[in-house]
Amino acid sequence: MYSAFSAHSLLNHGLYQSTMSLPDTPTPPRNLLIDREYVILIDTEGGMCRLHPQRFNAIDPIRHPFPGIVTNSVIVGEHFFVGTWVERDLSLARLALLDLREPIESGIEMSDLRVAVDAGKSNHHHVAGAVWSHILDAEPLAICEHDGDIVFCTHHRGIYRIGINSHEVWRRKPLGWDWLSDLPDGDVLVKLISVDDSIWAFSLGGGWVELDGSTGHVTRKGIHQFKSSTHDVWYGGDGNWLFSLSENRMAWWNSEAESISVANVSGPIQDACMVEETWFITGWRQDMRWSASQFHSEPDIGVRAEIGNKIVNRNEGGFWVLDNRGQWSDFVIQGISS
């Protein structure tokens, strides 16, 4: 469910130290999950470790519970990590839940898994240390938490809501949009986001749907004609959505005012959060600040040396950005525009 922590806020931790005092992550990041009690680093090879929630130093060694890259992940409830793993060459996919109160473990290596596949024993191997690990018959595409449960979708199979005990709450058939029927993979989902009592789903071709979180029924749906593919989506509250698009573009949509604006960027957006009606965005060697007063114009742009991977809002202390090397720096644009 959307909250202040959806914007990677660290208000309750009282952090005001400089990024100069923050250690590099032990390996280059693919994702960084931040919750009230946990900060989980997921690296580009599927390695995972916990970071200290205030100092951001590694408190565990890097482990590999999944045999490859973690494709989707989310922290669920107070203590649980849920992730997916896909190996297309082997036609394997897993969905697993880890208890973050327990040490993260390393599991089977890819070379050994290939041997198991050749021997017809791939089903004997699951995610190491998992409370549960399930075989999926289709590629998992997106995942989110909703009211303490797990919501995920798989390719052309549908959307599912399950509890942390893995019991099914509901499932629904795949979403579709008539206008996207002629667009290859136009209806393939790329993002699920929980907002209040709803779950929002976004597709590669610009389709969007608001689902009733308790039943999975469609509340409303539509299509954005971006003339670009949707790569990622962030929610900023009060109906504000930011889209990372192909063709070096991004879009700001307000679903309440039914207004939309598109801007050019230097490359893919990696992360974004909204504070005081202003988007703070990092990505391809640039940080951007896009305020409500600039809705129909270009955002402020600052150049950074590396690719920004994650933004952390430290409130009065400004913003930290974790780059693709695993190093921290300040958001390059200072202050909040009016």
Functional labels for PLM-detected ranges:
Residues 45-52, 88-107, 157-162, 205-211, ...:
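Structural motif
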Residues 39-63:
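Beta-propeller domains
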Residues 1-29, 52-61, 120-137:
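A short helix->beta-strand "capping" segment at the edge of beta-propeller domains
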Residues 124-129, 135, 141-247, 252:
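Acidic, serine/threonine- and glycine-rich low-complexity intrinsically disordered segments
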Residues 58-64, 106-128, 169-177, 219-225, ...:
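Beta-propeller fold detector
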Residues 59-169:
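Long, mid-chain structured domain cores
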Residues 40-42, 82-83, 151-153, 200-202, ...:
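Conserved beta-strand element within WD40/beta-propeller blades
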Residues 24-36, 64-79, 129-131, 135-147, ...:
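Repeated scaffold domains used in trafficking and secretory/extracellular systems
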